[in-house]
Design a protein with these regions (language model features):
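Solvent-exposed loop/turn and edge beta-strand elements of beta-rich ligand-binding domains
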Residues: 1-189
């Protein structure tokens, strides 16, 4: 069994009725992983991947033997001398994130911390606004926090394009789901 990933490494669970490979995990490093070859008697076997919510199965193919693919499962009939290789490819689910900073009554630089692909960043308003570029992020839970800036008060924080953001002062926790276009707007006066 070969496991390939696009967009990041992960751990993937498989089930089968193949002796020596009943329930197993493959963890990709450099976007690939594989089991060792396992000798099996002739017969029919099943193999299936338990697809994590953060990935989509984007490819499944087998070579050797007789296989019937019904994604994410495979029925494999192994004959004498067959060498069967099944390759599963998963692509990391992503969303996009944009942070907008609006100011009323002037311009300033505002610092943010985040555990997103943006990392820690600063936005300096010009004409009362500034934003990050739309950034692709893997699906998951993230925090974005605006650090208090002297002379400015946070008067509004709203995130759209995501379900149930949690606000706590200048911090928002978002749950980025597949294909969401999340926009968080911080307004200071």
């Amino acid at each position: 069994v070969v496991k390939n990933t696009v967009g990041g490494n992960g751990t993937f669970n498989f089930t089968s009725n193949i002796t020596g490979l009943n329930n197993f995990d493959l963890t990709t490093v450099g976007n690939t992983a594989a089991t060792a070859a396992v000798p099996v008697p002739t017969g029919t076997y099943s193999l299936a991947e338990v697809i994590p919510s953060t990935y989509s199965l984007t490819g499944l193919s087998c070579t050797g033997g007789q296989t019937s693919v019904q994604s994410p499962s495979v029925s494999i009939t192994v004959g004498k001398g067959d060498n069967v290789v099944c390759t599963y490819t998963n692509t990391r689910n992503t969303a996009t994130l944009t942070v907008i900073k609006n100011t009323v009554g002037g311009n300033a630089t505002f610092n943010f911390t985040s555990n997103t692909a943006l990392g820690d960043f600063a936005l300096t308003t010009v004409g009362g606004t500034k934003s990050t570029v739309a950034t692709t992020i893997p699906t998951g839970t993230y925090d974005i926090t605006e650090t208090a800036t002297a002379g400015w008060s946070l008067t509004n924080l709203v995130c759209t394009g995501t379900n149930a953001p949690v606000y706590a002062g200048g911090k928002v926790t978002i749950n980025a789901a597949t294909s969401q276009n999340i926009v968080c707007t911080y307004t200071n006066t």
